[in-house]
């Protein structure tokens, strides 16, 4: 039996709805997709693309190009592509929490999410820092953000923090939690019995024996030593400027970076179109596109669906394993 997955477009004025319409043009055999969105927005996106869409009841199978099972989420205001309306912030959050709630109840087996506009959600009166944080709070469990493409997987100890706040956030507890969640996910979700995880240092040259900072000596190395004694295969701390050399990437299954812009530029350079965002640690698979709302492209029919296609395929595989 194929898994049932929620598909949440995200910001209705962005490219999320039209990417869902494109996805619906190719019926899948690996998953039953149910889109959590406003039906009028989906019809408008289909019209803008000159493509057909037939919205079905959630339990109806998609058999023909354009078939799209729908869990309706009504917006407060009509969609104008390229122009977000904070009045629709509640609908965006309702779609995310509704889909995730159905995963927690066992009704669905995974969730694929499109891009959300943080500023618009907050302008709508809802405190929101990101979908990863939202779903973690709902599930009540610690999570790790991992971005991946066909070349490399990168997990983050810290995510959306100002750079000046990062050193203080790199605690022994935070690092150990990130490494344990990453290792467990590599085993459970990716089938790697003994995952090899590279760990980057925080400072240039991984601190150079304390000359360029003491975080490696005081925090990172003691944590790695402790977890190695528990059986984890950890490499590092490695200098970030050489860790991603092609000949080194074959030596490990995932990389743990200390902060957002330390690990992600290389991943995005090596294959941005196919990159996806995976939330490790949730009780269900959640995979997201690795791009923004692209308001300037919305409704024009030129948005690249590669990341959504990759996210959906990966979520289906992860859900089938769980």
Swiss-Prot record:
Major localisation: cytoplasm
Protein residues bound to a divalent metal cation: 160, 205, 260
SUPFAM superfamilies registered for this protein in UniProt: Isocitrate/Isopropylmalate dehydrogenase-like
Domain of life the protein comes from: Bacteria
Reactions it catalyzes: 4-(phosphooxy)-L-threonine + NAD(+) = 3-amino-2-oxopropyl phosphate + CO2 + NADH
Key word Transport present: no
Its EC number(s): 1.1.1.262
Miscellaneous: The active site is located at the dimer interface.
Family: Belongs to the PdxA family.
Subunit structure: Homodimer.
Protein name listed in UniProt: 4-hydroxythreonine-4-phosphate dehydrogenase
Classification lineage: Bacteria, Pseudomonadati, Pseudomonadota, Gammaproteobacteria, Lysobacterales
Gene (UniProt): pdxA
């Amino acid at each position: 039996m194929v898994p049932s997955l929620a598909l949440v477009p995200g910001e209705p004025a962005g490219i999320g709805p039209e990417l869902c319409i494109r996805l619906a043009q190719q019926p899948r055999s690996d998953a039953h997709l149910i889109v959590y969105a406003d039906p009028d927005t989906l019809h408008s996106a289909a019209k803008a693309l000159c493509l057909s869409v037939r919205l079905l009841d959630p339990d109806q199978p998609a058999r023909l190009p354009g078939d799209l099972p729908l869990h309706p989420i009504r917006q407060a205001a009509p969609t104008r592509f390229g122009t977000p309306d904070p009045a629709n912030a509640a609908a965006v959050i309702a779609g995310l929490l509704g889909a995730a709630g159905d995963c927690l109840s066992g009704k669905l087996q995974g969730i694929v999410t499109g891009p959300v506009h943080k500023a618009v959600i907050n302008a709508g009166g809802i405190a929101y820092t990101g979908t990863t944080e939202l779903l973690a709070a709902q599930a009540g469990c610690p999570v790790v953000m991992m971005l991946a493409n066909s070349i490399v997987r990168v997990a983050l100890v810290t995510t959306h923090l100002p750079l000046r706040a990062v050193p203080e956030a790199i605690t022994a507890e935070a690092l150990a939690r990130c490494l344990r969640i990453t290792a467990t996910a590599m085993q459970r979700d990716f089938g790697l019995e003994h995952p090899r995880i590279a760990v980057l240092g925080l400072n240039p040259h991984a601190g150079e024996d304390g000359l360029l900072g003491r975080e490696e000596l005081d925090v990172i190395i003691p944590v790695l030593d402790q977890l190695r004694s528990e059986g984890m295969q950890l490499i590092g701390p490695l200098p970030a400027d050489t860790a991603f050399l092609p000949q080194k990437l074959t030596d490990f299954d995932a990389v743990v970076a200390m902060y957002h812009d330390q690990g992600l530029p290389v991943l995005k350079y090596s294959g941005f179109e196919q990159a996806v965002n995976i939330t490790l640690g949730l009780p269900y698979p959640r995979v997201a596109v690795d791009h923004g709302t692209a308001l300037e492209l919305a409704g024009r029919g030129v948005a690249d669906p590669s990341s959504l296609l990759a996210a959906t395929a990966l979520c289906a595989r992860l859900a089938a394993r769980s």
